[in-house]
């Protein structure tokens, strides 16, 4: 009799737990650090060009990316973190930097939190994260925001 209740309780806990901000998850990034796609697109259109780093997979970058974005490696892996650190080494830590991935839904992105943590620890003071809730195609390209192919 107790077993079904225990199973139900454990299932409820499993459902609720991922919603909490966990270290290493995108939800651990402060809301104040997020920039919405329409905000970044408007800034680019107005000529305000932050340094933009794509921290996802190379194939995605090659298929389509934000104009001017630099590829900085898939930061969900150690070699990607090393690649990001190399890309960041030549950047002014006081200038505006926007990072994005867009490989998958925000809550499952393996790259964005690691990139945020790495650049924050390196001392970047004007660091923002492009909030892409679904994926780059749906939340940027299909909305008509500027894209470079290749």
What are these regions (language model features)?
Residues 14, 54-55, 130:
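Active-site-adjacent beta-strand anchor residues
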Residues 40, 51-56, 69-72:
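Short hydrophobic beta-strand that contains or immediately precedes a catalytic carboxylate
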Residues 17-34, 62-150:
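Rhodanese-like catalytic fold shared by cysteine-dependent sulfurtransferases
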Residues 44-52, 68, 126:
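Short active-site oxyanion
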Residues 31-43:
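A short, well-structured juxtamembrane/interface segment
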Residues 1-7:
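Bacterial N-terminal signal peptides that target proteins for export
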Residues 8-17:
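Bacterial N-terminal signal peptides
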Residues 41-46, 87:
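Short amphipathic alpha-helices and their capping/turn segments at secondary-structure boundaries
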